[in-house]
């Protein structure tokens, strides 16, 4: 049996006539005739393979809230199961052998070493994939519900036991699992399950919110695979996800540390700060107050850092935009700092690097922010055409708006990071303006590279060496090599 056959064993009651149980495989599939008698037993419904299921075991927590589910075994016997998470109720509609098996599984679960010693096996969300055809469907549905109940119980002991699989850890579920349960008792809370004639109560070991807040700062969640990356190690891995290799956002300081040799960074224009040229006041927060809050949050004065440094011994002028500061938006100060950097590089005959990460022009400064596009482009014209110097533009995710329309696309060499989101107008803006759906991936670096918009897509771990080779190719050499050549 293929593993995905057991990807889903539960389905909502309103889908009862649309989905059935494969008689030979014990699997769910859509029925071919949707007009048949709704009273017909599920065991007579014909099913087919290669289908997309409603949801799998790992998705149960997202679907079960206050709903009735219809489950059935391969004999066609149906059972209505009711879950009410808010009131912590679990009910089955009739007293059958299935009920007794399920009830026994609850008791065995409650008395198991799981609550006392912590979970030491594989991830329960993926145990269903290891089932084979010899397992009965009843056992599987028991396991599905059992796994779901396990996922709802605070598992502090899994932290202590040092589980290596993030999927079975309570930290993972509290950070990635979405909505947290409302619980005001610090000393713990209880979960009650009710069947006909019996009540089961399982104690939770601690308050979920407390644990969530306690460990949230230790982890960074991947935007692509939603896996957790230990923040302490993420910087040494260049903010690349350990699970899927996705390039996460980096601060400007981290990028400078990545590209510039240690001890060679000399920042420029650090004391330049934004004012409020058009006295922009929003209902939520005045512009100047917003600037102050971002300065405190990021430790930066503006959305770009500029300066001089050495890249593998080669002197370079570099500007690095920071998306954490008001989305990397380009205001008058950002434009002025980049313009001064370009002019300084032209006077000192230095190669130029600008790392772009921006949402575009800053609306709080009106047309002044738009004029920065023309000012920077004019400075680049003199730098590239009159001074005949070398400019490398590095596009990271996201690069949009006025930055894309100006200096982002003016590089002699344009480099993009893998999976970077690069566009002029964002997907949402296009769809709302034109009432047309933007194809998925049409604004990703890989797709745009095929259309000729970039020269290279370079991963972070290779970026510094690639830049070094490019500079040497354009006759910019390390300082020690320059002095030896002069001699």
Swiss-Prot record:
Main location class: plastid
Enzyme class, broadest EC rank: transferase
Record bears the keyword Transferase: yes
Cellular component aspect of the GO annotation: acetyl-CoA carboxylase complex; chloroplast stroma
Pfam families: Carboxyl_trans
CoA carboxyltransferase N-terminal domain mapped to chain residues: 218-487
Domain of life: Eukaryota
PROSITE patterns reported for this sequence: COA_CT_NTER
Region (Disordered): 180-201
Gene3D superfamilies listed in its UniProt record: 2-enoyl-CoA Hydratase, Chain A, domain 1
Cofactor binding note of this UniProt entry: Binds 1 zinc ion per subunit.
Reactions performed catalytically: N(6)-carboxybiotinyl-L-lysyl-[protein] + acetyl-CoA = N(6)-biotinyl-L-lysyl-[protein] + malonyl-CoA
Function: Component of the acetyl coenzyme A carboxylase (ACC) complex. Biotin carboxylase (BC) catalyzes the carboxylation of biotin on its carrier protein (BCCP) and then the CO(2) group is transferred by the transcarboxylase to acetyl-CoA to form malonyl-CoA.
HAMAP family attached to this UniProt entry: AcetylCoA_CT_beta
UniProt name for this protein: Acetyl-coenzyme A carboxylase carboxyl transferase subunit beta, chloroplastic
């Amino acid at each position: 049996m293929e593993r995905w056959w057991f990807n889903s064993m539960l389905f909502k009651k309103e889908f009862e006539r649309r989905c059935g149980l494969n008689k030979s495989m014990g699997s769910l599939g859509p029925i071919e005739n949707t007009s048949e008698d709704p009273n017909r037993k599920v065991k007579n419904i014909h099913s087919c393979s290669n289908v997309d299921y409603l949801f799998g075991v790992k998705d149960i927590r997202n679907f079960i809230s206050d709903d009735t589910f219809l489950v059935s075994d391969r004999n066609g016997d149906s059972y209505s199961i009711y879950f009410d998470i808010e009131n912590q109720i679990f009910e089955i509609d009739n007293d059958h052998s299935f009920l007794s098996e399920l009830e026994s599984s609850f008791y065995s679960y409650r008395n198991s070493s799981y609550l006392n010693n912590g979970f030491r096996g594989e991830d329960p969300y993926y145990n269903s994939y290891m089932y084979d055809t010899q397992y009965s469907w009843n056992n599987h549905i028991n396991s599905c519900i059992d796994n779901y109940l396990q996922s709802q119980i605070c598992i502090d002991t899994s932290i202590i036991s040092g589980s290596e699989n993030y999927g079975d850890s309570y930290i993972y579920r509290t950070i990635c699992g979405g909505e947290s349960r409302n619980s005001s008792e610090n000393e713990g809370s209880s979960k009650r399950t009710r069947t006909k004639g019996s009540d089961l109560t399982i104690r939770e070991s601690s308050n979920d919110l407390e644990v969530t807040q306690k460990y949230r700062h230790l982890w960074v969640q991947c935007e692509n695979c939603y896996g957790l990356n230990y923040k302490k190690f993420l910087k040494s891995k260049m903010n690349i996800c350990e699970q899927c290799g996705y390039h996460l956002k980096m601060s400007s300081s981290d990028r400078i540390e990545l590209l510039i040799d240690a001890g060679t960074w000399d920042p420029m224009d650090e004391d330049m700060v934004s004012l409020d040229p058009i006295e922009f006041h929003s209902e939520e927060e005045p512009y100047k107050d917003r600037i102050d809050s971002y300065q405190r949050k990021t430790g930066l004065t503006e959305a770009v850092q500029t300066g001089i440094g050495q890249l593998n011994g080669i002197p370079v002028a570099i500007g690095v935009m920071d998306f954490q500061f008001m989305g990397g938006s380009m205001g008058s100060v950002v434009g002025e700092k980049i313009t001064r950097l370009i002019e300084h590089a032209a006077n000192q005959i230095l190669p130029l690097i600008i790392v772009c990460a921006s949402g575009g022009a800053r609306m709080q400064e009106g047309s002044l922010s738009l004029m920065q596009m023309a000012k920077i482009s004019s400075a680049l014209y003199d730098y590239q055409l009159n001074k005949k110097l070398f400019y490398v533009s590095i596009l990271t995710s996201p690069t949009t708006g006025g930055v894309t329309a100006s200096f982002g696309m003016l590089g002699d060499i344009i480099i993009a990071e893998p999976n970077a989101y690069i566009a002029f107008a964002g997907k949402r803006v296009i769809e709302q303006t034109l009432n047309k759906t933007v194809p998925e991936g049409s604004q990703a670096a890989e797709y745009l590279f095929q259309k000729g918009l970039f020269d290279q897509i370079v991963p972070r771990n290779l970026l510094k060496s690639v830049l070094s080779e490019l500079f040497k190719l354009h006759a910019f050499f390390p300082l020690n090599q320059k002095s030896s050549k002069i001699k």
